Amino acid sequence: MSPARGDANASVARASGGSSNGAVTADEVVVQVDDSDENRENLRDRDRADKLEKLEKDAHARSQTQTQVQAPPVTVSSFRSANGDAIRAYRSETALTMKPRPRGSTSSTPTTTIPPLRPGRPSSPESPSLKRLSPRYSPTILASRTSRFSNRTGIRDSQSPSPILADEMVGRESLRKRPATSNTPAPKTPTPKNTEWTVDKIASALSVLAEEVPQNHSRLVNFLLEETEKRAPQPRHLSKTDPFAHMKSKAIDANRPRPEGVPTMDVKFKQHSGEYGKSRNSGRRFQYPVVCIKPDREPVPPYRFHHAEIRKNILALNSQLNFVPHLRDVDPNSAEEQKYSAWLMDLENLDSKSGFKIQPRSQKIAKRAQAEYAATLAPYLEPWLRKLNIEGCTKSNLIRFMASQPESDDSMTPQQKSNLLDTYSDDMGSPQAVRNASMFTEAWDRVFNDQSKLRRVALRDILMLDKNVEPIFDNKRAKDAPGSQKPPDEALMQKVIDALGSYTTLGCLICFSHDCEHGEIERDNQKRCFSLEEIGGLMPSLRRKWAAQIEQRQKTEGGSANAPPAHPPCRNECYRIHGTGDPNQQVPPWSENEVGTLEWMFATIGYSQTLRPECFVGAILGRPCWDVHRKLQELDLRLPPVEPRTIPKQKSLPWYDRRKKQLMSDWADATITHEHAVRELFAPCHHDGPCTAANGCPCASAGTHPVLCERFCLCTAEECPLKFTGCACHSSGKTCLQRQREGRPCICVQLNRECDPTLCKGCGARERADPENAYDEVLHSTGCQNVALQRGAAKAVVLGKSQLEACGYGLFAAEDIEEGEFVIEYTGELISHDEGVRREHRRGDVFDEENKVSYLFTLLEQEGIWVDAAIYGNLSRYINHATDGNIMPKIMYVNHEWRIKFTAIKDIKAGEELFFNYGDNFPNLTKKLVERNEQSGAETTPQQPKRANGAATQRATARKTTSKAKGEGIGFDDDDRDGNDSDPDDLWMGDQQQQQQQQQQQQQQQQQQQQQQQQQQQQQQQQQAQKPQPSTSHQPQSRAERSSTETGSEEISPDKQLRRENHDAQRQLLHQFQQQEQQQQQQQQQQQQQQTLPRKEPKKEELEEEIDLDAPRRSRLKRRLEALKGDSSSGGSANEQPPVKKPSRRGGARPGAGRKPKHRPPGAKGKDSKGKKGPSSSAGATTGAGSGESSGVNETGEEEVAVNGKSDSKDEAKEEETDKEKEEDEKVNEKDREKGRDSLSSPTEEPIAFLPVTKSAPSPAKKQASSPTKISDSNRTTSKNTSSNNNNNTNNNNNNNNNEFPSPVISPRKTRSSDHLTNSQPAALSPSATTRKRKASDLTSDTHLSAAGKGSDPSTMTTTTTTTTTTTSSSSSSSSSSSSSSSSSKAQPILEEKGDDDDENNEPITSPLKRQKTSSSLSSSHSMSVFSEAKEGVNGAVPGSGRNLRSSGVKVDSSGLNSTSLSQERGEKHEKHEKEKPKEKKGEKERERERDRSEEADEELLPMDRSMRKRQKPARYRDEGE
């Protein structure tokens, strides 16, 4: 056969298997090529019109007679297999052979056998899809469907043409190449005949074309299956026999009884069918015998969510419930199914409240099927339009027609409609095209949008999937319609804005990418990028840039803005050398895109001195520089005029200096920049003028407190006082820390942000924030230490089973971590709070609500932004909860994004589990769950031990809550470390020593509780459980032990005698449970009187009279006594333990109450106790009964004073009042007024602050002795020597369970009490401090001193300040023996004193350490001075100086047993003081003489009156100490 010429008779037939009706049953195609002379002759006659007309009629007649043939062969006019050309088929009805070739037949013509064109094509009759398109249609080649398991020789190779393409080519040729009429020769490319299309014809044609969709889908699936089978791996079985092939089912008939002793399992098989895949109820149940296996290994903890590891947070849109969560199979019409359905309704209601359109599940399934069907039909639209060849009916015209319909107005905005019409304005058709588009749309909806079909889709749904239509409905920037003629500069800027619109909208200002995770989700559930649109768009940024360039050029050159550039000419034939070049030189013409690039680059470069647009654009486009310069002159491009900037001078803020880069005092109260959780998010400011609230600056008017302007704001440091300019740290040594060796702390650290590599230039943050230097330890050993998150070098951590029972997994440290080091970042999806609530509810198990797992973390509470680490996150999601954790989360501001950083708060060894206190870090749902389980756990959980060595308490659990809660917090069982079931070989839980210590500790605590219950029969258990102490701490002694220790002592110290006398005077006011110990005090009192001088014993009536005097200044005290009596009487029934007197903010049962604060102006009136300010506020009168006696520091830093017993009534005290004492009181007041002693203390004095420490130096008792300490009347004490024992004995006497806090310690520096927020710390008061501060508080208090018995150090003493109506007898009478032993194990309480330089006379500060040296010159023991001062406090003498020794008349030697006249001691001190008089200052002499004059009236003054005088410490004590 000649491949170049001739129209050979080629017939395509199938090798039949002997079918009578000519059906095709063969698996191969046979092509017969007829190259005979007769055929050639027929080709010559083809051009004759009469011959063709006759042949056409004959062919038409034959086609009607052979309609029964299923697969007729097709004649191929030419077949070129040698060169691989495509098949070309010419319709020749004369050569058409309709007979199938029988099996085994022969022919004289050569026959060529080829494989089928398309494997797997089903055997079917001629496709009517193409036959109905034209009456002159000829059948195309139809290949038979090969079996998937047939011979591989019939599979098409990759080089063979696609059968779909071949069909389409044959169809096109058949439609296009029609025979010419008999009078005219046939043209080479005949013009198709125009068809008058109607809606019915189009619908019929679309119905035929629709049949291709399932056929092509089946071909595609078959092809994919066969290709997969070819690439399937070979089986690698060890044996060719299948051991399970002959295995029979061991199912037991459910109707038969179960065999005894054989465990079985019920299995139900369900078949899902019907609409939407619902299961049938006719499932059969089978029973299978099973063998229960218990492995020797511990099972791996289960978890529900497998996370995808991410390094940074990612944005997540609000998502609707797309599928129904499957928890487990439930029986139909059961209670579980109803509960499950109700839960699904709750999920849908949450979506509805969030703004989503809720549809029934059936509609959702139908809509999903509709979307899938639309995606399937979308690729067929354009090919079908080309086949139908309808005039003007193109896809563009269909989109324009869709946009112009009235029903489209409801689904699109006018702007979107305008954008659609403008986008497809280039292909505007004729009116006939519009009519055809309307007919095609109607026909499409008739065929594919039938309401009776499950899968239906409208033409609009197909067109909306177009790649040009979808972005228009995605909030794309609208293009301005062409308007009137604009000036050249405005027209240029409009072109630049249009050209750079995508960069302006999508370009991120942080990472400079166009698809990143920076930005936020708007309310319409659309992402808003952090781009130039956030700061006003492109034009404001360009204008500011031009203005800055002009100012810089004027400063450097002093010329105009059009001055020549300073940089040298470029090497690309620069225009500065060649000008506009040779005009005769041929250059390529400029395209439209090149001109646009030149325009927007010209505007972007602006007035730069270092870069010219000619040189830059020439390098980009590959053109000579002079060519670009010539084009610029042709275009005559000019920038719009720029107004010069006027920078007004702005003063620095009082709390922030942008030039010094530091924060001033009280900055935390002036701004909320550092409080990320409560601040609001504002777009960077881009206004004109200064950044002030009056000018509308969002940064300056951010609520009541401004925030600093960030580097993305368009303001500058010259004009904005709020502009953040980075830190001023240097790069030598380790810098950017909270506490630095030199200079102020880093401002970035203070503001809870990491150093900005752009702004912080001195500390080296740029090099250390580079990820390439993340593991360069040498570089990070110096310089900035505040770029941990930007560095991204987390500590090595591993995942393992948590130490908390039923908690699943936990995170463990794989290396040693020092305190303050960065551990890991908490990453996840950034979601809104509404989305977080829905996700939390979806993940819950409706059948097991207690087992909920939460991975939500509150990032910005004010803005409602959470971090969800359930699906996307890192290993930090496994960190569990503990009250005392070893790491702490912190929200940091890092380059305009907020991130969560975990830092170690203590040293962590490798292998320790990481914990942190969830607290308020987790959102509402988790928080409520935690609180609920805490309440349930507190009610049902016994006391849990605390881990030894100060480790974190494991009673709190992780975020993974469970119904097995038995502990506090969220509630789980005790840690295995606290039990007896821990494995000693376990790496994480083998700690036998700690377990033994905890067991011993539990036994000791139980014994102590039993002893306390026996001694305190009327006392019930306290409301709060006793908190455990480490095994190394000292356990308080019980009352029985202290009583036995004191009664067994052979000798009584003088200071104990004073306490007995004081208790005897108040014996009738004590609680009932203290009466037994009062009898022991009376016996010891007789022995004490033999060793001490006789003294007047205060009577009960006198003490009551001091409380209930009718003077106006005691009115506040009366109200407090009444409140105290009411509280004690009401709370006594429930808990008979004496109430604890709780101090108010400015008053209460504490020394120095009622004094003016420092910030209070003189003459300012205090407020009464009815909820107002004042020294006797009833708010701090008492605490709840049963809370235990305690002594410490309240929330304002002032001392809490322990109060025992009950107060007597006001009337009873008045009845016992005597006239003689009234007269004495009036005389004393008269003397005070004469001597000017009624003045209050200086309002500049401040109360005492306590500093907690962990341990104290075990110094000997004699070294601790010091001179009597001076007590200021402004709520300060300076007792150092007795503070440790005071604290121990106060706790032992008042609250045996209150040993959880460390003892307060003296700090020699000045400290405000408000600087320390230590709550409920024991207060240690010296005798002089107790008496003096008691007088200042309108509450007549007595001083109880506790001294050691025989064998005890007399320097270890305790004072407990209590009111007369609520004092303790025996509880504070026998604590010296325990205090001496506890002083070595517990911290020495040392009180902090504010120096006298803050007082009126500005005396220098006296260190408590210096006062210790004074004891050697005053007395030989510390107990002497304390005893003398305490005695003076009870009898009326003013303590605080050496004159108390003279008035008391008692001297005690170093052993505390021998006594002499105190007047002699006073005389010795006076003589020594006279020798040192030249050293004293004038002010000190005057104050000393005033104190000497006041000593005569000290015995007569009431404690309340004495408290109103200011007492200064004699200077001689300081001189002697120095």
UniProtKB/Swiss-Prot annotation:
Residues 971-988 have a biased composition (Acidic residues). Residues 658-780 form the CXC domain. Its main location: nucleus. Residues 190-220 are annotated as: SBD domain. S-adenosyl-L-methionine binds at residues 809, 852, 854-855, 880-881, 926. It holds the Pfam family EZH2_N. Residues 361-480 are annotated as: SANT1L domain. Residues 1-196, 406-426, 933-1522 are annotated as: Disordered. SUPFAM superfamilies: SET domain (SSF82199). Zn(2+) 2 binds at residues 570, 574, 615, 625. Residues 39-61, 1053-1066, 1207-1221, 1228-1238, 1465-1494 have a biased composition (Basic and acidic residues). Component of the polycomb repressive complex 2 (PRC2) that consists of four core subunits icluding EZH2, EED, SUZ12, and RBBP4, among which EZH2 is the catalytic subunit and which minimally requires EED and SUZ12 for catalysis. This is Histone-lysine N-methyltransferase EZH2. It comes from Chaetomium thermophilum (strain DSM 1495 / CBS 144.50 / IMI 039719) (Thermochaetoides thermophila).
